[in-house]
Amino acid sequence: RIAPKGFKPDVPSLDLKSVDGSLNALKSPNPAVRYLGFQALKNFGDSALLKVEELLQDKNSYLAARAIWLLPHLGENGKKKTVTLLRSKNRDQRLVAYRSLRRTGENMVTHARALSKDTDAGIRRDVAISLRFLSFDQSKDAFLEIAKQFDGQDKNYVEAIGLGAHGKESQVWEHLKNKLGFQKSPMWTNAFARITWRLGTNKAIPYLKERVQNTEFSIEQRKFAIESIAFINHPDAPDALLELGNTIQEEELNDVIVEWMVRQGLTDWG
């Protein structure tokens, strides 16, 4: 590290036997010292709570965030304080509080449902990813709220929904389709079409075929439906594209079908 000539660093002594000393260690820029402070404060438990809560008010948001990561480890009162931060006016505090509760193994069903309605898209994305570790029954309400607020443009948002739905894609897609009133493909919004593309369930194939064949949709929308079928890793997908290739009249769409048949035949379907 570059330093002025004659510079002598003043390294503070490490005191992990007191709450104040451990708190100073937690504030350290050195990750190893910070870890020691974190562990020491964990061991102090409820007796360190007041001092850690004071750190929440620090003007340095990074130091305040360290307090949130620690709070759920300080007994039931610390966990309750963390839960209250899920309703903070500060979006960063809400996000870190949600993540810190997850890390402690807290049952996140109720918290996920609450924050699935959050006004901040970044927080909803985080909630969506966390649903990966919940069952369909536990997560379906949160998925519905998150899907309702998708603008159809945010690629990270739709990817978060896909990651969260891993292993239960068909159930999530059917639930969203029915609850959002998209039982017929002409009713679909572009947002739901993109969610369908990401979830990649074979349950969507008949609806996607209908979109490809329906001339009321734009060429781009029909191409996107072809692409959505192509990304479905199920035996019904190549059969559907083959059938469409034999019935679609537009050369532009047929070229897209052939391109995807070749590409996927050499990779996912090969």
Question: Locations of the language-model features?
Answer:
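Long, ordered, helix-rich scaffold segments
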Residues: 2-270
